[in-house]
UniProtKB/Swiss-Prot annotation:
The lineage of its organism: Bacteria, Bacillati, Actinomycetota, Actinomycetes, Propionibacteriales. It comes from Nocardioides sp. (strain ATCC BAA-499 / JS614). GO terms for cellular component: ribonucleoprotein complex; ribosome. InterPro entries: Ribosomal_uS11, Ribosomal_uS11_bac-type, Ribosomal_uS11_CS, Ribosomal_uS11_sf. Part of the 30S ribosomal subunit. Interacts with proteins S7 and S18. Binds to IF-3. Located on the platform of the 30S subunit, it bridges several disparate RNA helices of the 16S rRNA. Forms part of the Shine-Dalgarno cleft in the 70S ribosome. GO terms for molecular function: rRNA binding; structural constituent of ribosome. This is Small ribosomal subunit protein uS11. One of its GO terms (biological process) is translation.
Amino acid sequence: MPPKSRTAAGAKKVRRKEKKNVAMGEAHIKSTFNNTIVTITDPTGAVISWASAGTVGFKGSRKSTPFAAQMAAEAAGRRAMEHGMKKIDVFVKGPGSGRETAIRSLGAIGLEVGTIQDVTPTPHNGCRPPKRRRV
């Protein structure tokens, strides 16, 4: 099979990032035991910016720290503020250690935090949980 060559017609199309002017939005913080992911959307749910502890530069077990969650929230919040965001409602999901620090850092960079809701999914005795960890 001949190697694929890139031509002008077959080149990847890169979409330009357009400046959305959104004053109010939602911050979805997913905090697991291993990582923290912060996604900022407009009220309809379209993603404006996102960051995780891994994209900010933390690797391995350092991703699960509250400081990594703080840095991820600041990075996502600053990118959202470039699009004109001023006020956010926060939705927190998961049991991780970076929940509170992520919320605090969103307020510290200048975003006005409105409501804070915990949307962690809890089973009505559905799937069997993983076995207990023995160290």
